[in-house]
């Protein structure tokens, strides 16, 4: 089998990494459906910037919610998974999203978390963190 140009072998994700990716995609889909049922409009999913990624950007009336989705074995485990470092990356990414979407700059902004666990309804944590922390 020929090697790709440059001689490097292509990276192959471990089965654990593939499973985590699929779990994340499924959790984000559940979270988006839950938000839509609550009257939010999804503006972006998996929005990437050089600073980080925002799982979901959602709007309801004059509010923009930047939502971090966490899927774990329990809702409590999911709640502890949003670390201060991740919070700062999401805040930085949100600034990038707002720069790319200046029409939303005057909206109220909020940083939420959506906690997902098997056999549980999603838990939407409003204002889970803010840009001043």
From Swiss-Prot:
GO MF assignments: nucleic acid binding
Stretches of the chain forming a coiled coil according to its record: none
Regions crossing the membrane: none
Disulphide-bonded residues: none
Pfam families: UPF0102
Secretion signal, residue range per the UniProt entry: none
CDD domains the record matches: PoNe_Nuclease
Similarity annotation: Belongs to the UPF0102 family.
PANTHER family in the record: UPF0102 PROTEIN YRAN
Protein name listed in UniProt: UPF0102 protein bll0669
Species the sequence originates in: Bradyrhizobium diazoefficiens (strain JCM 10833 / BCRC 13528 / IAM 13628 / NBRC 14792 / USDA 110)
């Amino acid at each position: 089998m020929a090697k790709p140009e440059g001689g490097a072998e292509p990276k192959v994700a471990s089965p654990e990494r593939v499973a985590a990716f699929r779990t994340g995609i499924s959790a984000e889909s559940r979270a988006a459906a839950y938000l839509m049922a609550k009257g939010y409009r999804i503006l972006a999913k998996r929005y990437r910037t050089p600073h980080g990624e925002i799982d979901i950007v959602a709007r309801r009336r004059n509010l923009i919610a930047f939502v971090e989705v966490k899927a774990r074995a329990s809702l409590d485990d999911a709640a502890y998974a949003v670390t201060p470092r991740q919070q700062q990356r999401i805040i930085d990414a949100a600034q990038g999203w707002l720069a790319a979407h200046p029409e939303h700059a005057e909206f109220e902004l909020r940083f939420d978390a959506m906690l997902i666990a098997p056999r549980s309804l999603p838990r939407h944590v409003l204002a889970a963190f803010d840009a001043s922390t």
